[in-house]
Amino acid sequence: MHFDFSVKFLMSLMLAPVSVYGSLPDSVSSHTNIPEVVVTGENHAPVPTTNTSQTLSLKKSDRLVLQNVSDAVRRMAGAEIKDYGGIGGLKTVSVRGLGSKHTLVCYDGMPVTDCQNGQVDLGRFSLDQLDEIRLYIGENCDIDAGALHFVSPSTLNLMSSAPIYSDKNYNAVAKITGGSFGFVNPYVSFDHKLGDHNSIKASANFSRADGNYPYTLTNGMLKTEEIREHSESVCGHGELSGRFLLSPKTHLRAKTHYYVSDRELPGGVVYYNTVNNETLKDKNAFAEVVSRTDWDSTMLMIAGKFNWSACYYHDEAMMYPGGKLDNRYFQREWYGTAVVRHNFTDHFSMANATDYILNSFNSNIHGCVFPQRHTLLDALSGKFKNEKVTATATLLGSFFFNQVEIGEAPDNYQHLSPSIAVSYKPFAPSIYFRASYKNIFRMPNFNELYFNSFGVRTLEPEKTKQYNVGATYLYESDKSLESSRLKSFAISADYYFNKVDDKIVAMPKMFIWSIVNMGYVEIKGIDFVTNLEVATSKRTSLFLTAKYAYQYAVDLTDPKSDIYEHQLPYIPKHSGNGSVAFENPVVNVSYNVNAVGKRYYLPQNIRPNMMEAYAEHGVSLYKTFDFKKFDMKLRGDVVNLTDKQYEVVRFYPMPKRSYKASVEFKF
């Protein structure tokens, strides 16, 4: 199917758009959950408030033909995924053209970080362990959060499910998925109620694939059929968590997590040379505790986390002494946060969050300086809310202290970062207008500062300014009116303008690369999301979702440069996706299309650097059977239905048509 047709299909979905409910409460009490916009999922979708926020419910994710976490994030307005291909390829998220290092990834509200390269691989998380995904852009309207949540232009929060008990004191899930290219993925979880208010949960996930999929290698007029080799991926995780009521006012959450992956790296496709011997093994373990106490008008949250990561890189080639290279990288992070919030009136509250972070890094590579970074963050926030207006404002103080064991450490850094957001509900309970501004920055990561061949210790932070205006309309039919066919409808649009100063880029100098501050970038764009739920009969329903994004992201560093006003690499001007799901008593059917316009993989926008537009289609059939003692769900997927070959990252071809099937039991 051609890309132009896919864009027209997306636009038709947008003109006929997800489920919504409820107006906002008038108080800012400690038990108020400020709603956001839900892309799709269950039959509810709270609205955007002061910032641009979206929630993707995964309880009904079959409607979207989702394959993994990165595929789910791709459906959210403003989010782009960089995928290095293959079953186990690195998958990172960038929001509104700012780059993946500007996106904070959290798991159950606690940060997931990487001080070495500043980006998190979404492939380490499984959809099976998640309940919903939230994306916040700009000012964080949740002033109960730790200070680190205010540091990034956007925050991606992956939320696991809280246990729900009805007539029994346990829940159990067993699921196995199999598919093309040797893919096997079993998952199990078990949670148990302890007394009236406490529970524990254990889960484990394992996946394996050989990843040897076919692709077409094109060199001018010559085309050959090849097999992507050296692509085996094996990974798994185990997790133990608990929720406890320590007193009538105090709740405690605790979690331990271990993840390991062992991947062959196929590398980029090079003409007539498909041999690659690189492997990468990752290990990660963390333990965290979160305590929250709610009094009548005051909330206190204290949380701590220890995170350990190890990365083992191996390569074999004649260029290395002894014919092989073994590099090892280790990270440790200690994180602590304390948040206090007080409601002065029913409409006004203030909060203060203080975070401390200690990052350390070591490696066996020559020239490692064994760096450490102490970070102190303090965020003072205020929120006002009445029937028509919601406003939040934050002043973030950031203090960074750098240390190295060898040589001279980079300068310490401190900065004050303001942000503000306002939403207005003028006359109808379902119409909201919003505007926001955020001034923030990104510290250089350890690779950019210290890496042996190109790190530069004099780098300045990358500074960003975000401006956003938007509007949302929501409709939900009266539950008592069963005759109403239109059950829910939501439409949301945002215009944004981002400025980036002192952009950190890699530049070639003679025979080596160097990291420098040399860029000024402007990004202007539009995000559009719409959803629709229609009851086509008493027993059948139709669900439609659509997203469209326009981005004009250009380099304005030097008017004399060959790349002045050229679109930034890997950022398409046009992209979007849409889905249609038909649920009925026989078998449920869902269809999805993800379309991406042309883009360039190098800064200069010339024909040799252009990557063609593509559209990927998927179809899913799913059915749940309710038995007396358990539920069983069967699902089958066809991914890349039209057998389209495309690349998300240049020289890393994605798989063509593939198949998946799964069976899930819930007890």
Model-derived features: where do they sit?
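N-terminal periplasmic "start-of-domain" segments of outer-membrane beta-barrel proteins
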Residues: 35-64, 92
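Extracytoplasmic beta-strand/coil segments of soluble accessory domains associated
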Residues: 70-111
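A beta-strand signature from Gram-negative outer-membrane beta-barrel systems
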Residues: 127-173
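Flexible loop and strand-edge segments within Gram-negative outer membrane beta-barrel domains
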Residues: 209-215, 224-238, 243-302, 306-332, ...
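Structural signature of Gram-negative outer-membrane beta-barrels, strongest in the C-terminal barrel
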Residues: 247, 345-498
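Membrane-embedded beta-barrel scaffold of Gram-negative outer-membrane proteins
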Residues: 301-315, 433-436, 462-524, 531
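Gram-negative outer-membrane beta-barrel transporters
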Residues: 346, 388, 486-490, 494-499, ...
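C-terminal beta-signal and adjacent terminal beta-strands/loops
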Residues: 544, 595-602, 621-667
